[in-house]
Amino acid sequence: MAQQTPLYEQHTLCGARMVDFHGWMMPLHYGSQLDEHHAVRTDAGMFDVSHMTIVDLHGSRTREFLRYLLANDVAKLTKTGKALYSGMLNASGGVIDDLIIYYFTEDFFRLVVNSATREKDLSWITQHAEPYAIDITVRDDLSLIAVQGPNAQEKAATLFTDEQRHAVEGMKPFFGVQAGDLFIATTGYTGEAGYEIAMPNEKAADFWRALVEAGVKPCGLGARDTLRLEAGMNLYGQEMDEGISPLAANMGWTIAWEPADRDFIGREALEMQREKGHEQLVGLVMTEKGVLRNELPVRFTDAQGNQQEGIITSGTFSPTLGYSIALARVPAGIGETAIVQIRNREMPVKVTKPVFVRNGKAVA
């Protein structure tokens, strides 16, 4: 039986089409995925992301533990509330999950991990935390709502108390603050400004309704996927998994190689991959008619004249740009163009950086 978030009833009242998403009943859309997508790019939309897992870590050695557990280095976190994106890797350098870490105090950090990997993540974290005497608290008492879009912060702020408005005033991207009963973070998965707001489960339905009244459009998983793909953001299980290195998933920037004497899980394997060479994640753009879909083959001829083949990890029609875009994992050496096999047709595509839209504007 699929689980329901505390907002399940609100979704049905808003006319959602519900689907089973990794064991959770979640809204796919509320009538028009396209309208929801455009609302986030031009105004304000909101997503129930309560299926994600918030994990609080307490203990005097928490920073030391996270420096070993994660490929990115929490030594960078010195300002209260600052957030960091990282891969959590296995010994062979594969990605167990990608997550966000918030720093509050030396003995209090918060992780936000994916729903699809919840049990695996908790088991891995618990196993490796034992020698560090970390107190692990899974915050199933909290719901999480993402409010995203150019007008999202302004509209969300109409629900805040004076204390909460003051707490978020001037807050830079990738920070979080606890203000009253809300944890408000300037993070998201759309390429737009906004907040991700955690609150007690019993407050979630009223908060959702108030956001609707403030003119924030409910959005489902469908729009969430096209928005994150336009923004060039990875989806676990597609761009990366336990068999795929962050180096092959455009996550090289999340690996803190320095200081060289910091040991973290997967470091040795990554150093070998870096020396030998590895696949890369690129963007693809197809302006001709047709849609780039997941798992379609991508072919190109490298500088030595050798035929090479990669694969589309995520592909869709971009509502913002009006043509098809994709992320693809390919061998090193790809040039500016490639061929994608769509049924019996060989379609030319342009190779770009793996990001297409930022703050509503085309970058590809």
UniProtKB/Swiss-Prot annotation:
SUPFAM superfamilies: Aminomethyltransferase beta-barrel domain, Folate-binding domain. InterPro entries: GCS_T, GCS_T_bac, GCST_C, GCV_T_N, GcvT/YgfZ/DmdA, GcvT/YgfZ_C, TrmE/GcvT_dom1. One of its GO terms (molecular function) is transaminase activity. It is an enzyme of class 2 (transferase). The keyword Transferase applies. Gene3D superfamilies: Aminomethyltransferase beta-barrel domains, Aminomethyltransferase fragment, Probable tRNA modification gtpase trme, domain 1. Its EC number is 2.1.2.10. One of its GO terms (cellular component) is cytosol. Pfam families: GCV_T (PF01571), GCV_T_C (PF08669). Keywords: Aminotransferase, Transferase. It catalyses: N(6)-[(R)-S(8)-aminomethyldihydrolipoyl]-L-lysyl-[protein] + (6S)-5,6,7,8-tetrahydrofolate = N(6)-[(R)-dihydrolipoyl]-L-lysyl-[protein] + (6R)-5,10-methylene-5,6,7,8-tetrahydrofolate + NH4(+). It comes from the Bacteria. PANTHER family: AMINOMETHYLTRANSFERASE (PTHR43757), AMINOMETHYLTRANSFERASE, MITOCHONDRIAL (PTHR43757:SF2). The glycine cleavage system catalyzes the degradation of glycine. NCBIfam families: gcvT (TIGR00528), PRK00389.1 (NF001567). Belongs to the GcvT family. The glycine cleavage system is composed of four proteins: P, T, L and H. HAMAP family: GcvT. This is Aminomethyltransferase. The gene is gcvT.
